[in-house]
Amino acid sequence: MARIAGVDLPRDKRVEIALTYIYGIGKPTSQKILAQSGVNPDTRVRNLTEEEINKLRDIIEKNYKVEGDLRREVALNIKRLIEIGCYRGLRHRRGLPVRGQRTKTNARTRKGPRKTVGVRRKK
C-alpha cells in the first residue's frame, strides 16, 4: 500500500483519485502533481512502482502544504482572527456563518440543532 504524507492511499483507485484522499489535495492539484511527475493518471495505485511513489512523495513534500501542516495553519489563521476581534473572528467565536450568509432561517450546519424556546402561560 502506497503511503504518502502519512495517508495510506486506497490500492484499487486510480492515482488521480487516490491522491485526493490527502487533506489539501483536490482533483486539480492531483492532476498537476501527476503532470509534474510524469505518472499516468489512469494507473491504479497497486500498479505504481516504488520509483513513481517516491517521485510523487517528493513533489508533494517540496511544493505543497498538506495534512497536519495545513490543518495547523488553518487553525492558527482562525485563532488569529478571533484574537484580533475582527468581524470574521467574532462570527467564528459565536459559531455563526462567516461569509455573509443569512441566519434568520437556515445556517443550521453552523449553528447546530435548533434550541426550541418554550412559552409559559399563567395559570
Swiss-Prot record:
An annotated GO cellular component of this protein is: small ribosomal subunit
Per UniProt, the keywords (alphabetical) are: Ribonucleoprotein, Ribosomal protein, RNA-binding, rRNA-binding, tRNA-binding
The source's superkingdom equals Bacteria
The gene for this chain is rpsM
Signal peptide coordinates: none
Protein name per the record: Small ribosomal subunit protein uS13
Oligomeric state and partners? Answer: Part of the 30S ribosomal subunit. Forms a loose heterodimer with protein S19. Forms two bridges to the 50S subunit in the 70S ribosome.
PROSITE patterns xrefs: RIBOSOMAL_S13_1, RIBOSOMAL_S13_2
* Keyword Lyase assigned: no
Q: Quote the InterPro entries the UniProt record gives.
A: Rbsml_uS13_C (IPR027437), Ribosomal_uS13 (IPR001892), Ribosomal_uS13-like_H2TH (IPR010979), Ribosomal_uS13_bac-type (IPR019980), Ribosomal_uS13_CS (IPR018269)
The segment annotated Disordered runs over: 97-123
